[in-house]
């Protein structure tokens, strides 16, 4: 078993970061995620948003793994459960693979919280537990997978910034459009008075 952990601070408020986290896929930074399906989404009586999603991924595999499973590329599926608590301002996301579970398990946990000293920033704490089963090189493979997870986490943070930039651009566009819509009737009314 290999445990990988990371902490990152986003220079954006919690509301922005959690909105982006829910819209992270697809993105150009991590094209291995080829599909996201929402299986269930509901708000519980306390106001927490619960989501259960299925992520479809396609990976190019290292040669040692190819020889073990007999494939060069493989589609895998990951189940993801998240809980967003708008009162406590926390988002906890847990994911686990549901493909190849007889060979490997990857359990990941992400927690987004406002930065304790700066509410305009958000802290992401990330942990992955990797277990390769039934292979004599399991420790080596777990290390290799931890390295891949670390690289993908970096891509994931880039993707979050990309989504946040995209969301901000959409907000600016909608704001500009709304201003134009408001001005047009006002200009017409002013013209009609003349």
From Swiss-Prot:
Q: Spell out the disulfide connections.
A: none
Point out residues bearing the modification Phosphoserine.
Answer: 46, 51
Gene Ontology terms: biological process: phospholipid transport
Q: Which residues form the PRELI/MSF1 domain?
A: 1-172
User: What GO cellular component entries does it have?
Assistant: mitochondrial intermembrane space; mitochondrion
User: One Pfam family, short name please?
Assistant: PRELI
* Superkingdom, taxonomy of origin: Eukaryota
The record's GO molecular-function terms, alphabetically, read: phosphatidic acid transfer activity
InterPro entries membership: PRELI/MSF1_dom, Slowmo/Ups
The UniProt keyword set, sorted, is: Phosphoprotein
| Family according to the record | Belongs to the slowmo family.
Q: What is this protein called?
A: PRELI domain containing protein 3B
Q: Which organism is it from?
A: Homo sapiens (Human)
Q: What is the lineage of its organism?
A: Eukaryota, Metazoa, Chordata, Craniata, Vertebrata
Q: Which gene encodes it?
A: PRELID3B
